[in-house]
Amino acid sequence: MQLRKEYLIAYDIEDNKTRTIIYKQLLAYGLKAVQKSVFWGYVSIAELNAIKRLFDSSLTISDKVFITRVNMHEQKLDYSFGYDDKTFKDWDEYGHI
């Protein structure tokens, strides 16, 4: 059983300060910024709950976010530009974040 599961997180946050705080926090959780407001990576249930609390406490009614489970490391991308084959394969279950 994997301790961490693979997620894709995307957001649209108006306030620059809030957006910067969220960006830095997601990096601190070991997620990879695959675009400016899109993150991919593996998180534990506790980390996922902390990320949800971060969004709940930081977002306003005009902001948007979605978090979804993905399985990108095992499947071939239908189309991509600017990403190589290793972009979504660099995580080690027993490595460090």
UniProtKB/Swiss-Prot annotation:
Keyword 4Fe-4S set for record: no
EC numbers for this chain: 3.1.-.-
Signal peptide location: none
Chain residues that bind Mg(2+): D12
Keywords, ordered alphabetically: Antiviral defense, Endonuclease, Hydrolase, Magnesium, Metal-binding, Nuclease
GO molecular function: metal ion binding; RNA endonuclease activity
GO BP annotations, alphabetical order: defense response to virus; maintenance of CRISPR repeat elements
Gene induction: In culture expression is high during mid-log phase (2 hour), then decreases to nearly undetectable levels in late stationary phase (16 hours). During infection of mouse bone marrow-derived macrophages (BMDM) expression is maximal after 1 hour, when the bacteria is expected to be in the phagosome.
Transmembrane regions listed in the UniProt entry: none
Enzyme class at the top of the EC tree: hydrolase
Superkingdom of the source species: Bacteria
SUPFAM superfamilies: TTP0101/SSO1404-like
Obligatory cofactor(s): Mg(2+)
InterPro entries: CRISPR_associated_Cas2 (IPR021127), Virulence_VapD/CRISPR_Cas2 (IPR019199)
Gene null: resulting phenotype: No effect on expression of bacterial lipoprotein FTN_1103. Bacteria are as virulent in mice as wild-type bacteria.
HAMAP family: Cas2
Family membership noted in the UniProt record: Belongs to the CRISPR-associated endoribonuclease Cas2 protein family.
Additional notes on this entry: Part of a type II CRISPR-Cas system.
Protein function: CRISPR (clustered regularly interspaced short palindromic repeat) is an adaptive immune system that provides protection against mobile genetic elements (viruses, transposable elements and conjugative plasmids). CRISPR clusters contain sequences complementary to antecedent mobile elements and target invading nucleic acids. CRISPR clusters are transcribed and processed into CRISPR RNA (crRNA). Functions as a ssRNA-specific endoribonuclease. Involved in the integration of spacer DNA into the CRISPR cassette.
Oligomeric and partner information: Homodimer, forms a heterotetramer with a Cas1 homodimer.
Protein name (Swiss-Prot/TrEMBL): CRISPR-associated endoribonuclease Cas2 1
Organism encoding this protein: Francisella tularensis subsp. novicida (strain U112)
Upper classification of the organism: Bacteria, Pseudomonadati, Pseudomonadota, Gammaproteobacteria, Thiotrichales
Gene giving rise to this polypeptide: cas2-1
